[in-house]
Each structure stands twice: as C-alpha cells, then as structure tokens.
Amino acid sequence: GLGDVYKRQGYEGLSFTCGDIAGYEGVDQVDMVVTLHACDTATDYALAKAVGWGAKVILSVPCCQHELNGQMENELMGPVFQYGLIKERMAALYTDAIRAQVLEHMGYRTQILEFIDMEHTPKNILIRAVKQGSPRNNINELRKIVGFLQVRPMLVQLLAPEAYTFRDCLL
C-alpha cells in the first residue's frame, strides 16, 4: 500500500488521513501543506488550516472553483457574465487570485504558476506560498475585488473578514 511506499523512501514521519479538512484537528504545526484538486471550498479550508498551522510552504492545486461562479454579480461585467462558460472560467481565475491575495495578507510570498502543460489537464494552476513573516497590507485591494464582484469567498471569510465593510455585513 501507500504506507509501504513512503516508508521505503525514508518518509516514516509522513502520514495520510482521509476526511473533511474543515474539521481536521490532528496537528498543531506543520512545515509544508500540499493540496491537490481539493474541490471548491475544500481548498479554502486547507489553506486556512495551513496558515493556522504556521506552514512554511504551501503548494496548492485548486479544483472546481464553483463558489464565486454562483455569487459573482456586476452590472459592468453583465455582457461577459451572460456567457456561462466565460463566467465559470473567470470565476476560477478570480478565486485563485483572491486566494493568493489572502495568503499575501497573511504573510506569504505567493506566486500563481502553471505546473503542467494544458494538453494534460486544464486544471494546471499551482498556488505556491512561502512564509515571509510580515503580512502584506493589501486589505484595501481585497475590499475592492470582493466589492467589485459582489462575492464573499470562503478564504476571505476564514482569514481576512476585515475585507468586508460594514455595509457588506448587512447584505
């Protein structure tokens, strides 16, 4: 099984657990968190856990970014958002850009990279975040993007709720 593989490679301290990341409480601190195709907001919960655990490195390959697709509204973007496929793809890109901004707000140097050629899978975005220590003061940028799109992304709710103005809380 998988346990034998990682033991043969010298990773005896590595463990695997099957379950819902949102409720996982098995560790207090980690060096690195890797997520691969955690669907929709599962990526957000995994990123929030990674930040909470003080992960020095986060490597995340998001998948199925449906959350914003159902929330995005903007009169100026209406002519674009009327096309479901375009709106879906833009929602995925906005989701990952917002995730990167939140991680920077939490003190990570963040990059969004293509990690595999498009011919293999369209889900080829890697969010790479390395802990820098000092948070980036980008709350106004976060406020602008969530306000522009009229969205409440899960990762913002979990790690940067101050990005919402008082008026937003009344919605």
Range-by-range predicted roles:
Residues 2-6:
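Short, small-residue-biased leader/transition segments that mark boundaries at the very start
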